[in-house]
From Swiss-Prot:
Domain of life: Bacteria
Residues annotated as binding Mg(2+): 255
Keyword Iron: no
Protein name (Swiss-Prot/TrEMBL): Phenylalanine--tRNA ligase alpha subunit
Amino acid sequence: MRVTMSLEALTTEALAAIAAAQDLVALDQVRVQFTGKKSQLAEQSKALGKMDPEERKVQGAAIHAVRETINNALTERQTALQQAALAQKLASETIDITLPGRGQRVGTVHPVTQVQERICQFFTKAGFTVATGPEVEDDYHNFEALNIPGHHPARAMHDTFYFDANHLLRTHTSGVQIRTMETSQPPIRIVCPGRVYRCDSDQTHSPMFHQIEGLYVAENTSFAELKGLLINLLNEFFEKDLKVRFRPSYFPFTEPSAEVDIMDERGRWLEVLGCGMVHPNVLRAAGIDPDKYKGFAFGLGVERFAMLRYGINDLRMFYQNDVRFLRQFA
């Protein structure tokens, strides 16, 4: 009876100490005090061995009940203290959602690059492969192989940047077409985007600009197929059904040749690109039999397409690094 009363007093004291613990450190000290190896409860457990079996059974059950009561109280208090600590932490880290947000400025793709990618995507869906080549070109691939020999008057059409008598900054991406035909067998279906250079600078011309040229060589190509492809390109790029016309023109590397115009909202015809059937001399220079194969080619200025799509009247705006201008295309 004396031991049982002692256990009741121990339980009361332990529960009071647990309730008074204000943090987890203090609670752990209470746990050690009342359930540790040197606690009164542990001493009473050791004394069970000196009791007769019947008394040991009763007192052992009483000690177990007290230990379980204390442990349950410790667990509940620990949970309560942890929740209180978490609530305090959350309260101290509260975000004031009434504060105005701070916008993050992000970069974007340059409008010329956007237009170039848009055009190339159209042609890749049509089965074309994107091909690239050197910007520093030799005279042969830039002129000679394109049916423009040294004495040809068409060379006057190009204001060229020369490094020496045989090396220059390419004036078009047609050299990529020649290099591809030299190393590939028909059918050949490629588009060649890239920077080109001409000694010209004004509101509609730049010493450096971007061009996309296309080439299709096979046994049964036709001008009708070329027309259909380019009309589809223009309608998809400008997202409207356009009035399109093909005017006879002259390019030394195509025969027949044509320039393509579209009608704007004011009823004016605007030139957008050039095209034609590949000249037999060009096929022959690249090692392709012009009696067996035919081809068509076309070329367009990327900046020209961008100006028409976005209503820009000065090509130089693309390269003035004016962030106010460029942000409009983000």
